[in-house]
UniProtKB/Swiss-Prot annotation:
Swiss-Prot/TrEMBL cofactor(s): Mg(2+)
Protein's name according to its UniProt entry: Adenosylcobinamide-GDP ribazoletransferase
Source species, domain of life: Bacteria
Gene: cobS
UniProt pathway annotation: Cofactor biosynthesis; adenosylcobalamin biosynthesis; adenosylcobalamin from cob(II)yrinate a,c-diamide: step 7/7
Top EC group: transferase
Organism: Corynebacterium efficiens (strain DSM 44549 / YS-314 / AJ 12310 / JCM 11189 / NBRC 100395)
Family, as annotated: Belongs to the CobS family.
Length: 275
């Protein structure tokens, strides 16, 4: 992604098409052709379309869950394969961002030194631990959802987690650097975009919930989305204070943190209603 994220001049295409295709081009391994002009207009369109990437991942998750269900694969192995698929689909870039941010925050260093650690390509103990904990939490929660006959909720985790990425880049945040990916996207996301996506995902999930499990669970996805946004907002304020701004690693960390939070919340909610 970083290799495609340097500001260039040129003309823009239609906003919707450019945003969706470029989001998929930058933030997934899918062979989709994106924009050829890179600036803050491009960045804003990509961030507005960010949950589309999660929706695509969610559809692929549904296909994988259906296939593994037919084959009789255990919930634990199913969860492992689902989380691996998510990471492969995004080239593990959000995992890398989580590791970098954890190393920098875990250093408790002054902002200047913390930014140097954030830019260091090597992963330390804090970064490794954060990655391990996040993956373990997601695998365990997804396994619980599959075992609890709530696999449909798993399909919404990728899209909901990207609301956290949007919050990390909301209007009011300052890019850590005047160049690169963060400079194009940080501070571009309007809160009504996030709200619109939350409503859209909530309505869609409500329809699926009524079909798959009954009306009693329609509240889970909207609540999970709100919690993801609150957690990401808290994290965004913290990294802004510690680093003096936000970059692409912070957005990736926000997505990964939100995925873990959403997965746990959904698993606990389902367990509480069925236990």
């Amino acid at each position: 992604m970083s290799g495609k994220a340097h500001v260039t001049d040129g003309d823009h295409g239609p906003a919707l098409t450019e945003g969706v295709t470029t989001a998929l081009n930058w933030l997934s391994v899918l062979p989709i052709r994106g924009a050829t002009t890179f600036d803050r207009i491009t960045g804003a369109r990509v961030m507005a379309s960010l949950p589309v990437v999660g929706v695509v991942f969610g559809v692929l998750t549904a296909v994988l869950l259906g296939l593994l269900g037919v084959l009789g694969v255990t919930p634990l192995l199913t969860a492992v394969l689902v989380v691996i698929m998510w990471e492969l689909l995004n080239r593990m870039m959000h995992l890398d961002g989580l590791a970098d941010v954890a190393d920098a925050l875990g250093s408790y260093a002054a902002p200047e030194r913390a930014r140097e650690i954030l830019a260091d390509p090597h992963t330390g103990l804090m970064g490794f631990s954060a990655v391990l904990f996040s993956l373990l939490v997601q695998v365990t929660a997804v396994a619980a959802l599959v075992e609890g006959k709530a696999g449909w909720l798993v399909c919404f985790i990728p899209a909901l987690s990207r609301l956290g990425g949007q919050i990390m880049a909301r209007v009011g945040r300052t890019p850590l650097s005047p160049t690169g990916f963060g400079a194009m996207v940080v501070g571009t996301v309007r809160l009504w975009w996030v709200a619109a996506w939350l409503v859209a995902l909530g309505v869609t999930a409500g329809g699926v919930a009524v079909w798959a499990a009954g009306p009693a669970v329609v509240w889970i996805v909207p609540a999970a989305g709100i919690i993801a946004c609150v957690v990401s907002e808290s994290a965004g304020r913290h990294v802004s204070r510690r680093f003096g701004g936000v970059n692409g690693d912070c957005i990736g960390a926000g997505i990964h943190l939100s995925a873990a939070v959403v997965a746990v919340f959904c698993a606990v909610a389902v367990a509480g209603m069925t236990g």
